[in-house]
Amino acid sequence: MRWRSLSGHRFFVKSTTMRKHTAVEVAAALVFRNEKLLIARRPSGVHLAGLWEFPGGKREQGESFESCLQREIWEELDCGITVGSLVFKNVHSYSEKTVDIRFYHCKLTQGEPRAIECDALEWITKDQVADYSFPEADVALLEYLDRCPHLWV
């Protein structure tokens, strides 16, 4: 894991072993409220079904990661967000695909999140993270968040 800088912001980059398939680019929202973090459970019938993750999705061609995240949150949660700084980036290879995932600090700006394209939503505290199962691509981020209490406000 190493530090990178982008527009004056520092964030961590974690890279795991790459396999020989094209990376799927993903943007994910870190939405904190009242010392809790929003997570969503992946629906049945999709890759990594039943695991908990951070809301977001695949970036479309020509779309910025920030625009992708705003679109995905409207589609998945029926609410609006402001996308803030990049917090963490990870490239992780699964047997069937590689994901290049970027996690952004976000704020709710319109509506209340609803589980539209996921099985469930939860607001969890830092101490509850271990009670949920997350995809391997999120583990390095979770370790980083454990060391960053200032984000949980």
PLM regions and their residue ranges:
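The catalytic Nudix box helix
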Residues: 54-86, 125
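Active-site-adjacent beta-strand/loop module that shapes the phosphate/pyrophosphate-binding cleft
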Residues: 80, 89-112, 122, 145
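A conserved beta-turn-beta hairpin within the catalytic core of GNAT-like acetyltransferases
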Residues: 46-50
